[in-house]
Amino acid sequence: MAAKLQDLELSSEEVDRFSKAFKDPTFREMFIQYAEEISDPENRKKYEQEIYKMENERGMDIKFIHPKPGYVLLSSVNGVQKCYLNICSNDLIQKPEFKPGKDGEGKAGLHWSLPYSLSPGRDDLSKDWSKHVIYDVVFHPDTLHIASKNGKFKGIVDSTALEAVASQFNVTLDKANVRTLSMKYKGVPNPSVLRKPLPEASPKSRDLEDPLCFPYPYDVPTAVGTEKKDQKRVIQKECKQHLVTPEQDPNVQVAATPNYTVRHRSYVDLQDFRDSRDSTPSPVPKELVITVDLPLLNSAAGVNLHIAGKNLSLESEKPAYKLNVKLPYAVEDNQGKAQFNKVKKQLIITVPVIQHNILSLMQDHFQEARGEKDNQNKAEHSVLNKEHTDNSGITSARGTEKLLELEEENQFEGLASISSMDTGASHLPEILPNLNTFGKEQVVNQMNEDTPNVPTDNLVCPTFTCSQDPTSLTLIVHVRDIDENSICADVGSNHYHIRCYRKQSRAFYDLLVTFLPHDIIISNEVSVNISEDNVVIGLTKCPESFGFWKKLYFGVSGQSLQERRFVIEENINKVLACSIPLSQVSPSIQEHQPLIEVLEMTDEKTHIRLNEPKIEYVDSAEHNEQCTDHSESERDTSLELPNVDGKDSAEQCSSQVSPCKHNIELGREHTSERDKEPKPTSCTAESTSGQQPNDSHLVCPGDNCAQDSNAENKMACLKSSVQTTQESDLDEDDMPDNSDHLQNSASSNNILKEISSKDGSVQVISDHTTHCPFQFQNSLLFELD
């Protein structure tokens, strides 16, 4: 009962009033009398006579058209619900007329004019409480008589009724599934009214004080307007009704496309709202719900449904339905379910969505978009060839961000392997031979042709920073006051080349950035933003190259390129794996080797802390006693570490060291003080070979009478101090190394070139001297900084 009263939209107070009224016997008697009066034919005649008199007083002539049953057509309105068309007859409608004529092919025939009358649609309920709409189309009885004798003429009558209802009430009827029922009339007959103004009648003046005076609910038609409308209708009928279309032919049946809706359904999971990177709700729904409206079906027995990947197809023979839908996501066709709602005449299909990775979905999307753009680029490229333009894709950017695509043929074809992490970063590796020959010469020559006035000998490589994410790469060239008109850029699938100069100093800058062959960029999706401080270049990675890239090569075109590795986990792990064993370093160097602690490592900087150890030596007897004490119980030792970093910070910090069997005291002294007054220190350490040390005293590193056993003890002491600083946080640069040859090479090269950041001028400094308390064993850490 609740479902039946749902569409009434009654409030609780109205329901209470109705329930109380129908419980009253007096109200029930009055209600029965009212129903009998309105259904009595005699009372209806009196009602019509009274209406006729009132309309005459207003100057209107009305006629009540009572439809006589003929036959019923079944269809659907707007693809949602059933629709019944009662084809009726009445003598008040004009008779059909015909005129001989010819069709478009010159065949002789008859042009029929079929007058009709329409009544507004009314809603009704079927036995299963489903809604449907009923329309009455009234013709002259002679029209229905001819239709009963001639099948083609009946098709003209049916198409006329369908077109009249669709055009007059602005609805869409399913003409493909029109079916003639065996019944003669659907619902309760309801008369319609024809109104025409009387030509010589004078309407009665309205008295505003009369309580029965109310405004006329209908527009007062004029005789001229009525004649024009009738003529227009007759012309439309004559133009449309004399031909039998394929849709009207009963032998030809065209399937209708039903209405459908696709809904995305997901479920709330509290794990998607955690404070974590991987806890974001997925934009991909869990399942798709497809609702198909099939108003002419009573069950889903004759429906063929097929789902494969992203395609859904539905077919039905009687009634004829056909639907092909491309779903937005690939679905599990074997795990779906379908259910037919008999009340709403809907087929509800629920299928789960295949949960792909978001990155793979982006790759599919970019591949489809790239395929379309490649076709456009090929067409543009053919036009450029006709105009005798180069296919290098070089263009001058005048404050814009549009760059043409450069075709990179035969470039990076000889890549076989990647060089090891131990190699230096200031040369072009041998694994890129084609870059030195064809590809690089083509880029340089084309760039020189576009900028003929630029001196190639005075080109300077600007400083730049590079950052990346899985789908894009950003280059920031740190050059101020760049002339927008001077920018000349070249982009390819594996390289980007830019050349420009400053406004005031006219200093020319040239930067060529190349990538590995499998690291591909989309050449027609490049953005260039120019500001007073820098130039920001945005590159989009190809979908096949999504992810974090390992390295790139940069430099001035025509010169050797340098290697720059991205700070990613894989590169850092390789650097840390290249550690130098402590046994290969001499004890004298271990004594002066500082302890290096890496605090922060990014693309822009590397923050380290240096700790200079102070070693104290003690007698062998004390050493044995302390070793015995430590064998019984382990002690925690504190390590005082001064903050020595690249920022000259004066903060002091200390860290706790894990328990060990060595008692180590570390301090810090200035180099000048240690050179002037070397002080003897003591240290207690166990021999690495397990033997007891000699009884002789250990002296300071500057003492020439130090024995070999003292050196072994010092190395063991220093090794234990390195082990106490949590080996998991140290890399190969923290370990002691032999830096004598690095110091000699650094001292021999005292000539420096300094480039001014204001005007780009170069200043040569020949008397420059400096002192560094440590040396990098691996130059890669310095290059990353």
Curated annotation (Swiss-Prot):
Highest taxon of the lineage: Eukaryota
Chain intervals with Polar residues compositional bias: 681-695
Main localization, broad class: cytoplasm
Stretches with biased composition (Acidic residues): 728-737
Biased composition (Basic and acidic residues): 622-638, 662-679
GO BP, one annotated term: axonemal dynein complex assembly
Keywords: Cytoplasm
Any matching Pfam family: PIH1
InterPro entries: HSP20-like_chaperone (IPR008978), Kintoun (IPR034727), PIH1/Kintoun_subfamily (IPR050734), PIH1_N (IPR012981), PIH1D1/2/3_CS-like (IPR041442)
GO cellular component: cytoplasm; dynein axonemal particle
Localization per record: Cytoplasm; Dynein axonemal particle
Ranges for region Disordered: 622-698, 719-749
PANTHER family listed in its UniProt record: PIH1 DOMAIN-CONTAINING PROTEIN 1 (PTHR22997), PROTEIN KINTOUN (PTHR22997:SF3)
Family: Belongs to the PIH1 family. Kintoun subfamily.
HAMAP family for the chain: Kintoun
Protein name, UniProt field: Protein kintoun
Species for this entry: Xenopus tropicalis (Western clawed frog)
